[in-house]
Amino acid sequence: MVSMKRTLLTTALAAAMGLATGTASAQFNQFYFLGDSLTDAGVYGARFTVNPGLVWAQDLGNRYGLTVTPSTQGGIDYAQGGARVTQPSPLIPAGAPQRSVSVQIDELLHATPSLNPNAVYAVWIGANDIFVNVSAAGAGLLTAAQVQANITTAATDTLAQIARLRDAGAKRIMVFNLPDIGQTPLGKSTPTAPFSALSGLFNSTLQAGLASLHVDIIPMNMFGLFNEVIASPASFGLTNVTTPACTTPSALNCTTATLVAPNAGQTYAFADGVHPTPAAHQIIADYAAAIIEAPQKIGLLGEAPMQVEQANFRAIDGRMWSGLNTPRPQNKIDAYAVYDYGNFDHSNDTGGSDNTLNSIVAGVDMKISDQMLAGVAFGYTEDKGSFGNNGGGFKLDEATLTGYVGYGSGPWYVGASAGAGDLDFHNVRRTFALGAGSRTENGDTRGTHVMGRVFGGYWFNTSGTWIHGPFARLTYQEANVYAYSETGTSSSAMTFGRQKRESLMSSIGWQASGTFGSVRPFGRVTWEKDYNDDNRSVLAGLVSMPGNFSIPVFRTDDNYVLFNVGASADLGSKLIGFISVSATAAKDDGNYQAVTVGVRMPL
């Protein structure tokens, strides 16, 4: 990009801070980028950073396996250095096309009249409008009031351009506010220029209008992130946030051979007076990824109660297995206690997340007639979840109360249970890279959990030792995770909406049990099918900036096979012990295993 004056060349192209990448899955299939030199992937043959370094859009694309090149070369990055929102820019080189964001959207819509609703569209613009107006005011061509009016108009025009994307079919639009340009090397070298005030004016006008757009806005708080980098560069792996890394006036002409120090591109924040170094662009890309991936992580909270109910069922089921072929008197209470350990190892769909459950269940039941049994059980589960890729995790403590009843007549039997749980999620943490550093955002929330099931089966007695027969179960669950905000006030602290996860699971299979003296082995294999495993989305936003968006979250496999084998044995004149092992197979999202151990005795 060229400048109106040599000293303004570097100012004309927006300022920002950048970050470092990582890996994770995201539920969208394409990106499109619109903006100025902060996002320009090489319209002029080089980029406004330490070349051949990348800009944040390219770093983000690499994270998701996308090659980001300029649209002028057939790519998905429409940004052009020097661009303004709608007006022609004197900061664009003579003879080069005048491609404001308005023109960039024209080009995008010409190539794709109906926009891909599963893509993310990134818009970062406005800094050059500030640079041009400040320069005009310095030349006596505009008054301060006119400059303020022009910047307000630029922000309003940005909202109008975002609305054009919405009207053409875009569903998720990533909107960046401006960093504090007054804190850049250029801004600090011209302290009388109103860069900070105009950055704030543009941002406040832009942010005030986001809610009226009625489209998913993925907010990117560059103002906050920029100030955090300036305040604590070491936290991001940087050593210099005040002077440029390049010896050339413009980063467009900067390479690793023209640095003030050999590694300045990785330790300085600024390549020139306003443009980020590759290290800073990496920070921006990491920040963007952390925001858009956050709903997927938090969506796993809604899955955790489903696992708790499975642990409760294994505990009560183990108690029922222990009662086979062991007659008991009517109107006598049996008490039991069970420990269950479960491990859920998810696939890469969740970045390799993992859950470890430790459950204790205690209950009593009574044979109230020759055919009927009734009981109640109290359970407590600690579920420790990991988001995978060292991306944080959570802890769920759930207390449950379950009532159950069973009826048998000859070889037939049926039963039902109903219960509820109180969800206490704490130490919910998202950990993510920000350049060479990392950050963790924390939060807590609560929720409710209800569940009910009916089941039945039939026993064939083929010998005096073994019985076997069909088994069927239908289980309904509903978990509600309350909305919450993370506790920090940083640029990356987020809010998350209420989640509702429903499941209607059928289990159909065959089971068998034998008697060999005081030992009674048992086993069951079932086909599990969830009829209510619909797509879910989690609503999210920033604590520090308006705008909310929904991202589809992890969906469990709704077809798999479940195995359960174990045995019960007489441990004394009254005490009966039991143990079982459960495991899944053919579960595309990752299998789980569990061990259940318990004792039962009459009171």
What positions do the PLM features span?
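Short loop/turn positions at the edges of beta-strands in beta-sheet-rich folds
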Residues: 20-23, 311, 368, 571
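Gram-negative bacterial Sec-dependent N-terminal signal peptides
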Residues: 1-26, 405
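A detector of low-complexity, intrinsically disordered, Ser/Thr/Gly/Pro/Ala-rich segments
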Residues: 5-9, 19-21, 67, 253, ...
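Ser/Thr-centric signal marking residues that sit
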Residues: 11, 277, 445
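Membrane translocator/pore-forming domains, dominated by Gram-negative outer-membrane beta-barrels
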Residues: 332-603
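Short, Φ-rich (hydrophobic/aromatic) sequence segments
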Residues: 13, 17, 307-319, 527, ...
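Conserved active-site regions of diverse hydrolases
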Residues: 3, 25-328, 341-347
